[in-house]
Amino acid sequence: MHAPPLRTLRHLATALLATLLIGAVAAQNVVEISVAHTMTGGAHRDAFDRIIEAFHEAHPTIRIRQIPQDMEIYQDTGLIAMLQSNDPPDIWFQWGGDLVRRDAELGFALDLTDYLAQDGWGDSFLDASWSEGTGTMVGDRIFMMPYAFDVTTVLWYNTDIFAEHGLSEPETWDEFLDIVRTLRAAGVTPIILGNQQFWPLGNWAGHITARVVGMDLFDKALSLEVPFNQPAFEEAFQRFAELAEAQAFNRDLAGLGASESMAAFFQGAGAMHPIGSWLISNAFSSAPDGFSYDAFNTPVIAGGAGDPQSIIGLATGFEVSSRSAHVDEAITFLRFFTSFDHQVAWAEAGRFSPIEGAMAAAEIDVHNKALAELFLDANELVPPPDTGYPVEIADIFYQGAALVAGGLRSPAAALAWIDEQLALVR
């Protein structure tokens, strides 16, 4: 065998070097955008992954790096630790309301108002996206781009269990209590719920309380303008005492996690499960074949000062870091994500898209359609206490409600305890 001519070797080396240089330059030109969120599974995570894959094909010089965290870790310590670090994510998931206000006031979140005003991008969203109740704005400035509307508590129920015991959806609180008693007498756990982190029961407790005392008093108490220990709130907390007396909950209510209780509901461990609209996307991937379920809003509470047909909910969405070195690329991704076709796919994965017309165009689950109609038709939107108000205030309210629902304290004693604890944070 003859050795190749020296000239040929030089040509090969030159070509190889050129290829390496082109690859290095191309790699240097690729921008990475980090996105922190709580989508650890479910149909909506699959849809999000597919949207990112399509984005990479359309924008080969921008790569999306996902930072998923369990929701409870993310909400408690995960997100704030990232935001306070020297390398915060470029984009992160947030709940609308007080947390958006916090992120804006502390300088974490970028003002998105002018970006959304470009090329009619903001006009592609439903009007509810920019209403006070959804929590996307601080004053007249937009700091969170909504990616879904969430009804944060309805009563999901196992339709087979209801049918077996001859039960139908209740219209009033008294009818609801009758259902609870019937199920308990039959040896069925009426309500399966994991309240280890307090918010699952706490959100529902917030809705019940707002229904009884009215939004004005509800807002004043959670804003620390008036005490909780007064007759109107005692009347509201009496509803939790009624649930405790009827043995409505699973015995491990205080120790069970939110995810575990949802999984238990899918397996038939309880007849009802009070939680939000995200159950739908989880049911797509986690509920067994043949699992049949439906939902009803918190029943009408007689004599309540609040709107008897109110819902509890908010917008969730993405914020952009004010410290991001790649704001334009982050906005490019968000515009791609909220484009009509991708939002139709998002809706079909079980999320309530905020984009005009996406829900109507999507082939969506009947449950998702029903909750979308419930959200848009509601005259009053009650903010979840842990997003509409400072978390430290909401947590104390949640713990007080849990004391009553667990049969550990009377309504009056729990309300006195709430005021004592709040005195330390005023």
Go through the PLM ranges and name each one.
Residues 53, 57-58, 85, 165, ...:
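Extracytoplasmic/periplasmic substrate-recognition and gating elements
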Residues 89-90, 121-159, 189-192, 305-310, ...:
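A structural signal for short loop-to-beta-strand junctions that line the ligand-binding cleft
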Residues 180-183, 222-253:
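Glycine-centered hinge/linker elements that transmit conformational signals in sensory
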Residues 50, 54-129, 160, 164-171, ...:
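Extracytoplasmic "Venus flytrap"/periplasmic binding protein-like
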Residues 113-129, 212-235, 285-288, 300-309, ...:
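Short, solvent-exposed loop/beta-turn-alpha elements that line the ligand-binding surface or hinge
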Residues 126-130, 296-300, 347-396, 403:
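Long, aromatic- and glycine/proline-rich binding clefts that accommodate carbohydrate-like moieties
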Residues 98-153, 177, 204, 232, ...:
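Hinge/lid segment of periplasmic solute-binding proteins
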Residues 137-147, 153, 177-225, 270:
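Extracytoplasmic/periplasmic solute-binding protein
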